[in-house]
């Protein structure tokens, strides 16, 4: 059975791009547009992996990561961030992020990050 991934990004374009990259090897559990939805969907689906944008409305990826990790310390979360967001990445790691990819990204970097997180 394929591992389930929850895609979290306020940009439909970015969610679609991640879906295209991942759908051959993973099952997409669902998609969320903000951190509030991400936490709710995580609790509903219990996915193997979350691909989480950092900057989102309502609740950002850092806050959502922290809340998911409080609920499930073993959750695997990879942050998706833009170049120049180093300070936010440091906060995301403190919140419990397991890895990150930088936008714009290509399939090899996404798959490498996932492999690193899921085999750690």
UniProtKB/Swiss-Prot annotation:
TM spans (from-to): none
Database matches in SUPFAM superfamilies: CheY-like
Keyword vocabulary terms for this entry: Chemotaxis, Cytoplasm, Magnesium, Metal-binding, Phosphoprotein, Two-component regulatory system
Occurrences of domain Response regulatory (ranges): 4-118
Consequence of gene disruption: Deletion leads to the loss of both chemotactic and phototactic responses.
Textual note on the cofactor: Binds 1 Mg(2+) ion per subunit.
Binding site for Mg(2+): 9-10, 53
Subunit architecture: Interacts with CheA.
PANTHER family hit by this protein: TWO-COMPONENT RESPONSE REGULATOR, TWO-COMPONENT RESPONSE REGULATOR ARR22
Protein name: Chemotaxis protein CheY
Organism ancestry: Archaea, Methanobacteriati, Methanobacteriota, Stenosarchaea group, Halobacteria
Gene label: cheY
């Amino acid at each position: 059975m394929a591992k389930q991934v929850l895609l979290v990004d306020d940009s439909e374009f970015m969610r679609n791009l991640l879906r295209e990259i991942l759908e051959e090897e993973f099952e997409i559990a669902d998609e969320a547009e903000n951190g509030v939805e991400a936490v709710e969907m995580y609790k509903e689906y219990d996915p193997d992996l979350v691909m989480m944008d950092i900057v989102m409305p309502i609740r950002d990826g850092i806050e959502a990561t922290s809340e998911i990790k409080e609920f499930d310390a073993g959750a695997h979360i990879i942050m998706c961030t833009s170049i120049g967001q180093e300070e936010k990445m440091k906060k995301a790691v403190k919140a419990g992020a397991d890895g990150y990819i930088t936008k714009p990204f290509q399939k090899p970097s996404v798959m490498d990050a996932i492999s690193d997180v899921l085999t750690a």
